[in-house]
């Protein structure tokens, strides 16, 4: 027999899903079925919570306590950059491996770096800004009309000033 279910126990489950879509509930079932939750209901809740991330692959953090699930979106750096580009949502099934060619401002990069700061391994904010610029480079967008790596070189040489915090 399985151990008795403790109502105060908090379980945390991380899931990768596409924003605004109900993922395959068959994929959810083995993860959250044993915790006493309905996969269909949780799938609908995730789709509702990720509505403004339509079409982007994001991580969702499910905190489950006493058979209630709290849903928290944990966006990746690339998802934040693509959202900042303000492109119309594309159909994932039709277009694969999209290169984004938009342009975002350095201020938006700094804001994204501040959001990602707690997850970054860099010691200072300037290091986190460089991490985000590297992600912008791999997404394929420009920053203030320039290639992101040129801005990284400017930060290293001191030509571009980074905010302290």
From Swiss-Prot:
GO terms for biological process: positive regulation of translational elongation; translation. Ubiquitinated at Lys-48 and Lys-83 by RNF14 and RNF25 in response to ribosome collisions (ribosome stalling). Its main location: cytoplasm. SMART domains: RL11. InterPro entries: Ribosomal_uL11, Ribosomal_uL11_C, Ribosomal_uL11_C_sf, Ribosomal_uL11_CS, Ribosomal_uL11_N, Ribosomal_uL11_N_sf. There is a cross-link at residue 40 (Glycyl lysine isopeptide (Lys-Gly) (interchain with G-Cter in SUMO2)). The modification N6-acetyllysine is found at residue 54. The keyword Protease does not apply. Disulfide bonds: none annotated. It is found in: Cytoplasm. GO terms for molecular function: large ribosomal subunit rRNA binding; structural constituent of ribosome. The modification Phosphoserine is found at residues 38, 165. Component of the large ribosomal subunit. Mature ribosomes consist of a small (40S) and a large (60S) subunit. The 40S subunit contains about 33 different proteins and 1 molecule of RNA (18S). The 60S subunit contains about 49 different proteins and 3 molecules of RNA (28S, 5.8S and 5S). Component of the large ribosomal subunit. The ribosome is a large ribonucleoprotein complex responsible for the synthesis of proteins in the cell. Binds directly to 26S ribosomal RNA. This is Large ribosomal subunit protein uL11. It comes from Rattus norvegicus.
């Amino acid at each position: 027999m399985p151990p008795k279910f403790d109502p105060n126990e908090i379980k945390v489950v991380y899931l990768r899903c596409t924003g605004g879509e109900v993922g395959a509930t068959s994929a959810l079932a083995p993860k959250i079925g044993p915790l006493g939750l309905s996969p269909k209901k949780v799938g609908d809740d995730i789709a509702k919570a990720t509505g403004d991330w339509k079409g982007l692959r994001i991580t969702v953090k499910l905190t489950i306590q006493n058979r209630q699930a709290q849903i928290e979106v944990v966006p990746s750096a690339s998802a934040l950059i693509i959202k900042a580009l303000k492109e119309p949502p594309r159909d994932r099934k039709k277009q694969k491996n999209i290169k984004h060619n938009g342009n975002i401002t350095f201020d938006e990069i700094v804001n994204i770096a501040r959001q990602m700061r707690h997850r970054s391994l860099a010691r200072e904010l300037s290091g986190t800004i460089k991490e985000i610029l590297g992600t912008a480079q791999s997404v394929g967008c420009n920053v203030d009309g320039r290639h992101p790596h040129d801005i990284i070189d400017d930060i290293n040489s001191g030509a571009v000033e980074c905010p302290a915090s």
